[in-house]
């Protein structure tokens, strides 16, 4: 009987550890951001390529620009305090455009991950199966988005920059009065990634 209880406790303990780890980060990308004339710094983002491989690969390739187009030079066109910051419209810059590496749009991959905390990366869309290049980063828990938007990454460092952007002064369309621009983007090797941002969330 003692052996049974020991085995049960062992299973529960390591189950909790595994659950706390969350989805595996397979790739890390970065955005160097500028607001108006002010350089804000670098945000690094981990992508959950095991859980949502197609969605993660789309974002990774757009961050590197290896397909001939991508996020570099684009802006965060929509900012709502206590909700999220949205960017990735690489064709029009106003929330009506964007395109993926698979064509104009691609389907929702899955909804395995929930919008359970700030600092999560999720696909913006115009309805079911309409993913392109637009994305948003949460600044609060947003459970009402579960089942509608695909979560596929998290901020690893630079969340303080995300919070600063979320407080930017905006017009009546939620667009920052000063452009918040991705002046450089790319991919980091996993060996050189310092996961120091999760403590900020």
Curated annotation (Swiss-Prot):
Gene that specifies this protein? cyp4
First-tier enzyme category under EC: isomerase
Q: Which organism is it from?
A: Schizosaccharomyces pombe (strain 972 / ATCC 24843) (Fission yeast)
Q: Name one GO cellular component term.
A: cytoplasm
Q: Where are the transmembrane segments?
A: none
Stated family: Belongs to the cyclophilin-type PPIase family. PPIase B subfamily.
Q: Give the GO terms filed under biological process for this record.
A: protein folding; protein folding in endoplasmic reticulum
Localization terms from the record: Endoplasmic reticulum lumen
Q: How is its activity regulated?
A: Inhibited by cyclosporin A (CsA).
| Entry's EC annotation | 5.2.1.8
Designated name of the protein: Peptidyl-prolyl cis-trans isomerase B
